[in-house]
Structures are given as structure tokens and as C-alpha cells.
Amino acid sequence: MTNLKNLRGMLDLLPAQSQGWQKVESIALEHFSRAGLQEIRTPILEQTELFSRGIGENTDVVGKEMYSFDDRGGRSCTLRPEGTAPVARSIIQHGLLNNGPQRLWYRGPMFRYERPQAGRQRQFHQIGVEFVGLASVMSDAEVISIAWNFLKDVGLNDLTLEINSLGSNEDRNIFKEELKDWLNQRFDLLDEDSQKRINVNPLRILDSKNNSTKELLSEAPSLNDFLSSESKTRFDYLQELLVNLKIPYKINYNLVRGLDYYSHTAFEITSDHLGSQATVCGGGRYDGLISELGGPQAPSIGWAIGMERLVILAGDKILQTKSPDVYVIHKGKKAEQLALEITCQLRSSNLIIELDYSGSSFSKQFKRADKSRAKWALVIGEDEVSKGQLLMKKLRDKQKDEESREYIFSKGDLDQLIKKLIA
């Protein structure tokens, strides 16, 4: 019989790794709560139409990368490839904008059929923020600052913020025609993917990773030259706000986002430590998405961070596992019952308690206790039960405290002793 394994690009998150993820999520929860954000959770499975309308029929995501299928009712369904369109759908469906602008965050798995690489899998996880119903440039700056400061809270310092203005729809439409003419004159010099995109999604060519195409694009028309005075004023003010917030940035006029719904502000936060997968956070303004999906006109801005890449970058800063405060060692039937009772009692005091289940000798249990890196071992044997006593032995830093390595005490004094020994 063939051994069953996970699908390619869909990885198990093992206990040694999950603790780092939990740390990042706890930092996110605290950071976003301080920023006044509320969490929203949407289904993993959505109607395919949500993404074809919201993201754009001509994007790589919709055209090449989605996991789509017909369910047993004949409905076309898709495993969500990103989080913004589902959040937009939920806001419209439940009328959340009737209560005013929404400041939301989300987390969860996404799915894209891509070639798996370090930090990029077919099932991947994102944490994202969406400000919906806010048009102010101040909201752009605040959203960027939330991302920047969250990454700092996680412990990342070697980061680069790149920003660009994609202008209004009118700005982009004029620029697209100029860019298409320029590219068509140099068609044979473009890589194959870029040739396919000229008439479908020419702006995406600006983000080409092909070296020869990138070199050619250095002479291409710049979207910045086609921005209206209103769009330029908006972009200038964003830069002023970022300077005031002491957030360093670089302008990248070739920065475009891979989804069609973006306008005006676009940004990425990158790291040199991820190789070709340099982007840690990407986002921008999407003023037309809510109305495109059938809702009211609601200018919005948001971003998403890939958890896999974030955990890789954070490394040892978040992967330090917590050792037990107390490892409970026991031998004998009566001792077993008391050990379980005391374990549950101590856990209710917010302590990390590990209970030995091996039933082996005291010496072997002590070896496991030492391997767990617990600070103390609580020893319960038949003798201790008959005498109504418990024994606490220190496991760490023994050489520093030889005089107080052991404590013998009654069960009634347990809470008081624990408070004394484990501050």
C-alpha cells in the first residue's frame, strides 16, 4: 500500500514550527488591537465569480493560479487566492458600511497553483489589514505605518519600503495606451510572458523579473509623467506624512501590484534576506473594488503579509519555545491521581506544567524532566502520598543555588510555595 503524503506545495506545520507562528499571531492581535482594528474571518471557499470580477479576468492569479472546481450543485467554486475580495464581499453582504468606515484585519490560508519555493507554497497563509470607506491620504499613511510597526514588533529591522502612485483610472488608461505603443515597437526584444501581456495587462510588464526586459524598461515611459495634478498632490502628501512618521521609503516608479483593483497608492515592504521572494508585505489603495462587486462607492486601502516569509525572516527571534515551569514526576496509583489533580490546579494559575505519562522509574522521568528544560520537578511517590507531603527539586542553575535545591511541603502549601519559587 502506498504511503500517503501531503500534496506538493501544501506543508504540515509541525509543533516545533507552530510555536513561532503562534508568537507572530499573538503579536498581531496585540498590535492590531492597539490600532483599533477588528478581526474578520471569511470562508476559505468562495464563488469563482468573486475573484474573476474582483481581481480581474486578465491577471495571472485568475488565469493561471486559482484552484477552481464545480461542486455537486454545479456551482463554480474557488479556494481563495487572496483575502481582500472575500472581505469586500462580506462587507457588502452584511451591510457593515451602514455602521461607518471599517478598520479590519484577517488571517488564514490562501491557495495558488504556483511553483513551490522557500517562503512561497501552494497553500500559504496571510495576515492582512483593510481600511474600507476611507479616502484620506492619512489613511494610506496609517495603514503603511501599521504594517511597518508590526514588522518591527516581530523583530525585523533590515527592511525597505517602496512606494508608487498608480494614479486614477483615467491616468492609467492614458498611460496604458502610450506604454502599449512603446512596447509594440520593441516587441521582439521582450520576453515571452511580456509579449503575451502587452494587449491584456501591459502594466504588469513593468514588474517583469526578466533581466533583459528590465533593462529595456529603463527607457520606457513612466506612469509618473501621466499623473494628473490631483494624483501628484496626493502622492506628494503621502511622502510628507511618511517623513513626519519617520518611516524611510524609496520611490519605485515600476512598482505595480498584480491585481487589477489597485489605484493611487501602491507599496511593498521588502527584505534582502529572502532571495527572489523579497516581498514581505504588499498592498495599496482599491477605491473601485466594493462598487465593482455590487456595493456602494467605498474608497479603501489595505495590505497583506505572507506568514511563511515572515516566520523565515524572524527566525530565532520567535522560535524560542517556552520551557515548562514545572515537570510533574510520579510513581504509583495514588501518586498518579494526585499528580493529575495538582497538574490541573497549577495550570489554572497560568503556569506551564508538563505531566509525565511514562510510568517509568524516577531516574528515567528525571532525565525527561531535564530534557524538557523545566525549571523545577515536582516529585510525587507513594511515600509522599502517605505522608501528605510533596517534593520540589530545582533542575536549572543548580550550581548557583545549592542550598535551596529541594523543598518538602504539604499539599496545602503548594500555591504559596509556587508563587515564591516561580515569580
Curated annotation (Swiss-Prot):
The keyword Ligase applies. It is found in: Cytoplasm. One of its GO terms (biological process) is histidyl-tRNA aminoacylation. One of its GO terms (cellular component) is cytoplasm. The keyword ATP-binding applies. It catalyses: tRNA(His) + L-histidine + ATP = L-histidyl-tRNA(His) + AMP + diphosphate + H(+). InterPro entries: aa-tRNA-synth_II (IPR006195), aa-tRNA-synth_II/BPL/LPL (IPR045864), Anticodon-bd (IPR004154), Anticodon-bd_dom_sf (IPR036621), His-tRNA-ligase (IPR015807), HisRS-like_core (IPR041715), HisRS/HisZ (IPR004516), HisRS_anticodon (IPR033656). Its EC number is 6.1.1.21. It is an enzyme of class 6 (ligase). It comes from the Bacteria. Its main location: cytoplasm. CDD domains: HisRS-like_core (cd00773), HisRS_anticodon (cd00859). Pfam families: HGTP_anticodon (PF03129), tRNA-synt_His (PF13393). GO terms for molecular function: ATP binding; histidine-tRNA ligase activity. Homodimer. Belongs to the class-II aminoacyl-tRNA synthetase family. This is Histidine--tRNA ligase. The gene is hisS.
